[in-house]
Amino acid sequence: MSMKQRVIIVGGGPVGLLTALGLAKAGTNVVVLEAESQPSDSPRALVYHFPVLPHLKRLGVLDDCVAAGLMRQNFAWRVHSTSEMIFWDLSCLEGDVELPYALHLGQDKLSRILIEHLKALPNVEVRYSSPVVDCEVGPRSVRVVLGGESPGVIVEGDWLIGADGANSFVRREVLNQNFFGITWPQRYVATNTRFDFDKLGFGKTTMQVDDVYGSVICNIDADSLWRVTFMEDPNLPMEGIRGRIDQVFKELLPTNDPYEVVAFSPYRMHQRVTDRMRNGRVILIGDAAHVTNPTGGLGLTGGMFDAFALTSVLNQVIHDGRSEDILDVFEADRRRKFIELVSPRASDNLRNLYHQKPGEGKNDWVNNTRSISKDIDRMRDALRFPETMETFL
């Protein structure tokens, strides 16, 4: 019987948990194996574009997400050298899309909301402190061995989904796939900072354009907590980052008002994609399959679209007898959209924000960005890009 199907998901981040919820709500038995002891609370992705919201609504989690985060319609480009603010507004999509908003919600909060909803389902189990250390794949089954707090425990199932991030065990050790691409040379520092950007007229998301003080500034919650991400030389010592944050903020913030750095996390940015997202009973999604720099919020959005598309087709394979060939179509479309759409756009976003030198090229870009803000048809077209990332099968 189909109810006996068990899907093993390796990785308990938002992409893995969304996949579990979509499968379990359709009656598929699921187990999620997460190596860490709890959801990470380090500064990570927090913006979810408007095409994601109807999926969260369908899964029954949107109301909780909105209550824990905030919804916004506009965002701004700020030219650091002149202090000019250029606003684009999602309200131009009203009547065209179901929910013309972006959701701001910390990735850790989203994970905890998803876990609470999963707890209410009898056919899903989430196991923390359960790293996978070995795996055997047969023609109709998979078998994984756990380490950590459950050494030697064996979990058997019919499908294995690798949602275990950029350093994916499933990609490296089970599928033995390459992860070709580039690593951007700069280091980026994400901070959670308490400061009142609202009173300075910043958008809830503000992209500050400058080749030295370029930054992404996003409101995290209603308590004046904001994410501020900036770039620095990777040759600088890691141990001096906290002091350098204060130095950068002296130039980055247009005021001497006090601020509080609550948390910070340095990281490198990448553009990489696996050779294959599927081989037989093993499927990769999210950062396990492809990683992009997060400028513009396309990384987690792309991973969520992986999850939504996969749950749709895998539930059909398990419950409706649809041919497994549809999973190859899923793989081809998700890789193509990352390679042809997501990675190029995210790379353009990063270069425009952090690397434009003063001069004619930057002036042309600013003039074009400003002209879009005054032309509702062009702004509508520009804002609908995230829709192109989705897969319908």
From Swiss-Prot:
Optimum temperature is 25 degrees Celsius. The enzyme activity measured at 5 degrees Celsius is maintained up to 25 degrees Celsius but is lost quickly at higher temperatures. Induction: Expression is up-regulated in the presence of nicotine. Disruption phenotype: Cells lacking this gene are not able to grow in nicotine medium. The keyword Cell cycle does not apply. Pathway: Alkaloid degradation; nicotine degradation. Keywords: Alkaloid metabolism, FAD, Flavoprotein, Monooxygenase, NAD, Oxidoreductase. Transmembrane segments: none annotated. Its EC number is 1.14.13.163. Its cofactor is FAD. FAD binds at residues 6-35, 277-287. It catalyses: 4-(6-hydroxypyridin-3-yl)-4-oxobutanoate + 2 NADH + O2 + 2 H(+) = 2,5-dihydroxypyridine + succinate semialdehyde + 2 NAD(+) + H2O. The keyword NAD applies. It is an enzyme of class 1 (oxidoreductase). Pfam families: FAD_binding_3. Binds 1 FAD per subunit. Optimum pH is 8. At pH below 7.0 or above 9.0, there is substantial loss of activity. Inhibited by Cu(2+) and Zn(2+). GO terms for biological process: alkaloid metabolic process; nicotine catabolic process. GO terms for molecular function: FAD binding; monooxygenase activity. Homodimer. PANTHER family: 3-(3-HYDROXY-PHENYL)PROPIONATE/3-HYDROXYCINNAMIC ACID HYDROXYLASE, BLR0106 PROTEIN. Involved in the nicotine degradation. Catalyzes the cleavage of 6-hydroxy-3-succinoylpyridine (HSP) by incorporation of oxygen at the 3-position to produce to 2,5-dihydroxypyridine (DHP) and succinic semialdehyde. The catalytic efficiency of HspB is higher than that of HspA. Belongs to the PheA/TfdB FAD monooxygenase family. This is 6-hydroxy-3-succinoylpyridine 3-monooxygenase HspB. It comes from Pseudomonas putida (strain DSM 28022 / S16).
